[in-house]
Amino acid sequence: MSLVRLAHELPIEAPRTAWLDSIIKGDCVAALERLPDHSVDVIFADPPYNLQLGGDLHRPDQSMVSAVDDHWDQFESFQAYDAFTRAWLMACRRVLKPNGTIWVIGSYHNIFRVGSQLQDLGFWLLNDVIWRKTNPMPNFRGRRFQNAHETLIWASRDQKGKGYTFNYEAMKAANDDVQMRSDWLFPICTGSERLKDENGDKVHPTQKPEALLARIMMASSKPGDVILDPFFGSGTTGAVAKRLGRHFVGIEREQSYIDAATARIDAVEPLGKAELTVMTGKRAEPRVAFTSVLEAGLLRPGTVLCDERRRFAAIVRADGTLAANGEAGSIHRIGAKVQGFDACNGWTFWHYEENGALKPIDALRKVIRDQMAVAGA
């Protein structure tokens, strides 16, 4: 089955089955009208940079530098570029889920104008991320600093966009248990990853490295999420999404790019479920009520709980509360009360005895969560 859908053949707000895991051929704003409201989880946008190039650029050996001079990167004025930017961002905001996020990448030529439009339209900026290139192109004329980075803006749909995905624990673990910083070091796309045509020329002038897209998706999405790329180009977003178990929808108007992206995505082998399991922190784990521990038979009413040093004790009641010193309440309230504190995490404070050893009741909560995970698999 072909990946390609023609924008004008899709109905307005087409059903998910009509566009999921496909490339929609057409203008990005018109094509976005074909997607329903709140239908995508993450957007990655690599829009035209509106490069202000003044003539040809040559290396010291007089060979010409292959720069971005395609017609799709040409705008009559900054005002025209701003109008274009506002139009596609408005269309993207409509299809983004309330808890979704958008990534936009750009250079110094355009990223500040894009950032201003994002804020004006109600997006809420979460981070700017610097992609530092290990192998940037030199500044051949020697009139400026070497431009060795691009900037990504990461934003939620609006200020109240709570519940967006950020796989903090996974990013930290992947970074040797140190918080992932907002400056990322990757080489530009070269070697076998760089798509070439039959003449050995680059298929796309600004092909992004798969490692960059992989980090974005691993940080801000989950397996099964829908990733939209309104400027699909050579299909890096689709290829990485397929490999990482995400769905994608790309929008592209240039047939040569569509052909290259289609062949590229068709060749991708998705990773298995075990490789795609995302490490999560406690905040992302399902809530478990203490009464569930009793209902599962892991503790019985009348069991005496204590702290790890056996200074305080409480009795488990049949209704899932604890009783101590004439007071009754939740595991958290009674834990705080016996210590004279304002708050307490009862799961880690209270312990039960098993084979002569004290264990935190949090271990029983883990048993319940494991059962929930199996039931939901």
UniProtKB/Swiss-Prot annotation:
GO-annotated biological processes: DNA replication; methylation
Signal peptide: none
Residue span(s) of domain RAMA: 271-373
Molecular-function GO term, any one: DNA binding
Cystine pairs: none
This protein's GO CC annotations: cytoplasm
Annotated SUPFAM superfamilies: S-adenosyl-L-methionine-dependent methyltransferases
Gene of this entry: ccrM
Name of this chain's protein: DNA methyltransferase CcrM
PANTHER family assigned to the protein according to its UniProt record, in alphabetical order: RNA METHYLASE-RELATED, TRNA (GUANINE(10)-N2)-METHYLTRANSFERASE HOMOLOG
Listed EC numbers: 2.1.1.72
Function per UniProt: CcrM-mediated methylation has important cellular functions. Contributes to the accurate cell-cycle control of DNA replication and cellular morphology.
Catalytic activity: a 2'-deoxyadenosine in DNA + S-adenosyl-L-methionine = an N(6)-methyl-2'-deoxyadenosine in DNA + S-adenosyl-L-homocysteine + H(+)
Transmembrane segments: none
Record's keyword terms, sorted: DNA replication, DNA-binding, Methyltransferase, S-adenosyl-L-methionine, Transferase
Membership in a protein family: Belongs to the N(4)/N(6)-methyltransferase family.
Enzyme class per UniProt: transferase
InterPro entries linked to this entry: DNA_methylase_N4/N6 (IPR002941), DNA_methylase_N6_adenine_CS (IPR002052), RAMA (IPR040843), RM_Methyltransferase (IPR001091), SAM-dependent_MTases_sf (IPR029063)
